[in-house]
Structure formats: C-alpha cells, structure tokens
Amino acid sequence: RHKMISNFQLEDFELSQAHTFFWDKYEKSNWFLEQVIATADQELTSRKVAFLLQTPQQDGGQWDMVVSLFEKYGVVPKSVYPESISSSNSRELNTYLNKLLRQDAQILRDLIHSGADSEAVASKKQALLQEIFNFLAMSLGLPPREFDFSYRDKDNQFHTESGLTPQSFY
C-alpha cells in the first residue's frame, strides 16, 4: 500500500480486503473438500473428521496464507472491488458457507463409499467447488478478471492504467 502511494504519488490508497476475503473463503473451501476426500475412510466420529466438520472454514489465518493468496489471485484497489455487507460482517456468510461445506462433505463421502473412482470424485469436487464459487460471487460480488485503475496524483493530475489484471497489479 505504501509503495503504491509512493510510486503513483497518491494522497491515499487502499487495497481491496473483499477481494482477498473472497479468495480466502474459496481456497479454504477447496482445502476442506480435499481433507474430506482424504479422510473418507475414517468414521464421522474420528477426531480428525469431527474437527473438520465442526468448523469447515473460518475467518483469519497466517501471513504465509495471505501471501499465497496475493501470489495466486493478485490484488485490486478497493475502488474496483469495494466492501459489501457480507464481507464487512462475515458471520452470516460463514454460517451459510459452513452449512454448504458440511452438505458437500456428506455428498463426497457418500460418493466415495459407493465405490466411485478417483476421477468421479475429483469431478464431483470440482462441481461442488463451482457451487461454492457461485455462492461467494452472489454474496460478495464477482471478483474482477481485468480492470482499469484511474486516479489523481498529489498534483491533481488524472491518470488511467487500463487492462490490468489482479496479478499484474500485484
């Protein structure tokens, strides 16, 4: 942020927290589904499975996790992807997302226990992950693939950087 302010001679600048929030929820959901597949041979009452199902995902994380999100999905200005009610107050979103993930866990476990091959399981996981993406997009808005960044510098000169991607902006 400070480097952006300096490089572009801005008065102030904020990166979108909602953009990182979206991809954090998506990646945590993906990780959860991978863990469900990896533990499908264990009973629901096993400590690991019970722990996973208790809270499939939640807010927060560690620095290395957010750096990985930046590297994979990039960043965008807050003006391009602003906060929403769901990103500012995530309790309700987390409640629904965790319910959806638990349902998805049951679907995957049932599929695996029915003898489905790994290709069918992977395909189903991708379909479930697409549903999660759709849920997040409806709740938070669709993250931009490309955007224009317009700003006024400290000298009040107007600038536009066109055709940026979140990765190129990072």
Predicted region positions:
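Catalytic-core signature of thiol
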Residues: 2-170
